[in-house]
Amino acid sequence: MSFTFGQPSTSGASGQSNTSTAPASGGLFGSTTGSSTPAFSFGNTSGTQSGSLFGGATTGQKTSLFGNTSSTTPAGTPATSLFGQSTSSSSGPSLFGNASKPSGNLFGNTSTSAAGSSTPAGTPSLFGSKTATTSAGASSTTPAATAGSGSLFGSTTATTQGSSTPTSTGLFGGSSTASKSLFGSTTTPATGTSGSQTTPAKPLFGSFGSTTPAGAPPTDATKTAGLFGNLSKPATTGTSTPTLFGSTSATTQGQSSTPLFGAKPAETSTTTAASGAATPATSAPASTTPTLFGGATLTSSAPAASTSTSTATASTPAATKPLFGATATTSAPGSSTTTATPGLFSTTPATTAAAGSSTATSTLFGTKPATTTAAAASSTPAATSTPSLFGSKPASTTAPASGTPTTTTAPASTSAPATTTAAPTSGASATASTTTAGQDAKTTTAGLGASTVGPQSQLPRLKNKTMDEIITRWATDLAKYQKEFKEQAAKVMEWDRLLVENGEKIQKLYTSTYEAERASNEIERQLSNVESQQEELTAWLDRYERELDELYAKQMGSAAGEQAAGPDQERERTYKLAEKLTDQLDEMGKDLAKMIKEINDMSNTLSKGSKPDDPLTQIVRVLNGHLAQLQWIDTNAAALQAKVAAAQKAAGSMGANVPGTETDAAESFYRSYRGGLK
């Protein structure tokens, strides 16, 4: 195909065998007649005539810019002009976005086409008109229509379920199924019988789009939030694209968008495929995009299994984070990989309940990554999070039992409570929603519409700083670290010295313990020796007592023997007592002799040392003389008394023989004795 300003002719199969060539879009200055190979021109090159610049069209001619009407073709549908005039030709889009079948006007009039017709879908208008939707029945043979290009303000074009042609995106962010508008118009897809959906092109600025699921979910559609949170309910589950001020659309099988400050979206609705279509095993979840100030989104759940004949595998697209900490949640049927881009102030990354791994990127002020709940039969997921500037807590992974999906809630860094359905957020507060997922799905990566923005830089403190400031700060930090290192080194040195001293003390204690052990062993040996000696002495005493008992038995004898031996024992005791007294008397005599000898020696010493004319000596000598005379008198008196007694005894015997003489003799004796004394 050569260069042209019109849209080329495309064709797509919707699951049936019959196909038809889709009409091309109108050129700038009109359309040309059909040709197999278009050359370089400014008009349309398909068989069907397209709208001209000013929207007027005749049979087989192009439509002018302002919608002039002419004759119509029999099978065509009238196209509207700029201000709503209806034409009868099957014209292509004009400069301001008239639909090809039918053409839309400037302010978004909508025309429909009958189900089962082979007319293609049109191109959106300037301000987001809604084009016709083609509904394919169970037995329809209508071919797939070409996807219309996105207008300036994001009109929605009709899409067919079985279309394989990617749709072009709008100016500020395309979506997975159809082009997106700037102010959030809505697209309504057509229900096809079977087929697969392709991935659309990435939008111009790349951070707002998301991809459609790779499977064949029933009637997937895209819900686009308006500028200030317009609420519109899409036909089926799809992917929502954020607007300029962050309306949030949370879709779970057909939920509507959330306005700017977190209004509750519409309830969910579920659509069923046609009777002749194959029902996929898993329905693709919706990829939600959070708002600017943290509108909360609902969680989307995917069934674990379906009872249809064909099975489709879905992949979960990435969710784009808001600026001030909204919460977006996605769910994948089975194992899927979801990459979340963090917001500016404490957003919570999207949580993916899947059997695969979930990677979350941390935010600037330390958000807590959402938890990943694994529900697969025999696999344990791994959650990886990139640390933030202020120390976010990494994600925690919980692996439940086989076939049992669990729900884990993870609040944001502002300590907002977590719920399992949806919760509105206020300011920088975010609420993490939990998602559950089914089993038996393969792991896929994010689509082309996902954001490719990497994590924020970890060195914001070096921004807008001069080299001197950086070097000064580094020098200050180095000095501080050196001081801390020296302090730590001093502590370590003190600890090392204590360890050395304690080691020496322990060595001394060990030596003392060893010596005490040796001493205790020696004492035990000596005690054993003493114990043996005591045992030996006890043995000898027992033997001596036994021998004494035998000796006493021999000496005492019987009772008669005891009586005979009594006097002998008494004599023996008396003899022993006499010997003892004799020994004591001998000792006493010896002691007295010794005392006398000592006294005499002392007297001699005293007598030798005294002078002859000493009065004391003379007195002693006189006294000694008196003592000697007294002793002599005593001795002679005793002798004389003995003689007198003897004489009296003799005289008594004599007086018995001679009477009368006794008295005279006695008197004479007494007189003589008295005279002698006188």
UniProtKB/Swiss-Prot annotation:
GO terms for molecular function: phospholipid binding; structural constituent of nuclear pore. Its main location: nucleus. It comes from the Eukaryota. GO terms for cellular component: nuclear membrane; nuclear pore central transport channel. SXFG repeats lie at residues 52-55, 64-67, 81-84, 94-97, 125-128, 151-154, 181-184, 388-391. Residues 1-295, 324-461 are annotated as: Disordered. GO terms for biological process: mRNA transport; protein import into nucleus; RNA export from nucleus. Keywords: Coiled coil, Membrane, mRNA transport, Nuclear pore complex, Nucleus, Protein transport, Repeat, Translocation, Transport. It holds the Pfam family Nucleoporin_FG. PXFG repeats lie at residues 203-206, 259-262, 322-325. Functions as a component of the nuclear pore complex (NPC). NPC components, collectively referred to as nucleoporins (NUPs), can play the role of both NPC structural components and of docking or interaction partners for transiently associated nuclear transport factors. Active directional transport is assured by both, a Phe-Gly (FG) repeat affinity gradient for these transport factors across the NPC and a transport cofactor concentration gradient across the nuclear envelope (GSP1 and GSP2 GTPases associated predominantly with GTP in the nucleus, with GDP in the cytoplasm). Component of the nuclear pore complex (NPC). NPC constitutes the exclusive means of nucleocytoplasmic transport. NPCs allow the passive diffusion of ions and small molecules and the active, nuclear transport receptor-mediated bidirectional transport of macromolecules such as proteins, RNAs, ribonucleoparticles (RNPs), and ribosomal subunits across the nuclear envelope. Due to its 8-fold rotational symmetry, all subunits are present with 8 copies or multiples thereof. Belongs to the nucleoporin NSP1/NUP62 family. This is Nucleoporin NSP1.
